[in-house]
């Protein structure tokens, strides 16, 4: 039972870290990255569909994203979805391909992106600590089946797992901050 609680807690913490990785990848950091478009969906035959399912997204140059729809009829819908997104990019549509030119980031924009990165990191840490709290609560529910020492050891083990994941979050945030500020 104890092992199951630990595994569940670690699995949930791992998922929180994976969500952070996705969020960080979707941030505009001055370089073209197909993950920037992960959250954008375009209407395709009446259904909102992720761009990755509508087109091939490539990076021909460091600051250019190229979107080549598999169905040319979806070109306008993709262009519209990009325009209404919060990316702030202007698509160049040549009739077959959409090109997105990623502008150079100003110092102010970089600082705002770093604030967002830190917020994502803090939200992830809160999620990880929440998982720790849930795990500790489940361990305390087993009080009748375990000795005080075993409960203490289990709580310490969950704390070690938590510390490890919080450290990973800090490392990811530091790397992303340096990437944004060094462009």
UniProtKB/Swiss-Prot annotation:
Please name the Pfam families in this protein's record: RRF
CDD domains xrefs: RRF (cd00520)
Q: Could you tell me where this protein is found in the cell?
A: Cytoplasm
Q: Which UniProt keywords apply?
A: Cytoplasm, Protein biosynthesis
Single GO MF annotation: ribosomal large subunit binding
Q: A GO biological process this protein is involved in?
A: translational termination
Any one annotated GO CC term? cytoplasm
* Chain's role: Responsible for the release of ribosomes from messenger RNA at the termination of protein biosynthesis. May increase the efficiency of translation by recycling ribosomes from one round of translation to another.
Q: What HAMAP family has UniProt attached to this entry?
A: RRF (MF_00040)
Family, similarity comment: Belongs to the RRF family.
Q: What is this protein called?
A: Ribosome-recycling factor
């Amino acid at each position: 039972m104890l092992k199951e609680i630990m595994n569940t807690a670690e699995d949930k913490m791992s998922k929180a870290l994976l969500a952070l990785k996705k969020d960080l990848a979707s941030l505009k950091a001055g370089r073209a990255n197909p993950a920037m478009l992960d959250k954008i969906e375009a209407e395709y035959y009446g259904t909102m569909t992720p761009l990755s399912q509508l087109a091939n997204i490539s990076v021909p140059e460091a600051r250019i994203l190229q979107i080549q729809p598999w169905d040319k009829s979806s070109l306008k819908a993709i262009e519209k979805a990009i325009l209404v997104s919060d990316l702030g990019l202007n698509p160049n549509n040549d009739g077959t391909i959409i090109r997105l030119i990623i502008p150079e980031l100003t110092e102010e924009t970089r600082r705002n992106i770093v604030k967002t990165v830190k917020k994502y990191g803090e939200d992830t840490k809160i999620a990880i600590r929440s998982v720790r709290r849930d795990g500790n609560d489940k361990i305390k529910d087993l009080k009748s089946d375990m000795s005080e020492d075993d409960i203490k050891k289990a709580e310490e083990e969950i704390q070690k797992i938590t510390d490890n994941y919080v450290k990973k979050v800090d490392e990811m945030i530091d790397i992303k901050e340096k990437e944004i500020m060094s462009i």
